[in-house]
């Protein structure tokens, strides 16, 4: 099991990455994140929705109502600002993980 503190800060990046692929509603994001991470990332609705609201306030995502299988759902879509933020965070993550791997392996950082 992965220490939850390791996930802090990366959740926004992961959600933006999902939304870069397609617009999604909350439960769909929870399911997709779990699936793509082999159940390593399991978000609860009580964690997800405050993050989505904060991302919307920052202009990283927008939301809209649409019908899915006869049910009204709130979909989220990444904005241009959100794509820029995602690009920055991905670069920061590469630098961070490379530095961690360098220390753990006792040698030079490896390229991805």
Feature locations, PLM:
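Short, contiguous hydrophobic alpha-helices characteristic of membrane insertion segments
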Residues: 4, 60, 110-112
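Conserved anionic group-binding/transfer micro-motifs
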Residues: 29, 48, 82, 93
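A cross-family signal for key residues in well-ordered alpha-helices
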Residues: 14-17, 31, 53, 87, ...
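N-terminal helix-turn-helix DNA-binding core of bacterial DNA-binding proteins
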Residues: 2-47
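Beta-hairpin "wing" of winged helix-turn-helix
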Residues: 56-72, 77
């Amino acid at each position: 099991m992965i220490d939850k503190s390791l996930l802090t800060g990366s959740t926004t990046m992961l959600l933006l990455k999902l939304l870069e692929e397609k617009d999604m509603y909350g439960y769909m994001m929870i399911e997709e994140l779990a699936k793509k991470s082999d159940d390593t990332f399991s978000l609860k609705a009580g964690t997800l929705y405050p993050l989505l609201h904060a991302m919307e306030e920052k202009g990283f995502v927008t939301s809209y109502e649409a019908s899915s299988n006869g049910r009204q759902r709130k979909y989220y879509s990444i904005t241009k600002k959100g794509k820029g933020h995602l690009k920055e965070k991905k670069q920061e993550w590469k630098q961070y993980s490379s530095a961690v791997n360098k220390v753990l392996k006792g040698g030079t950082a490896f390229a991805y």
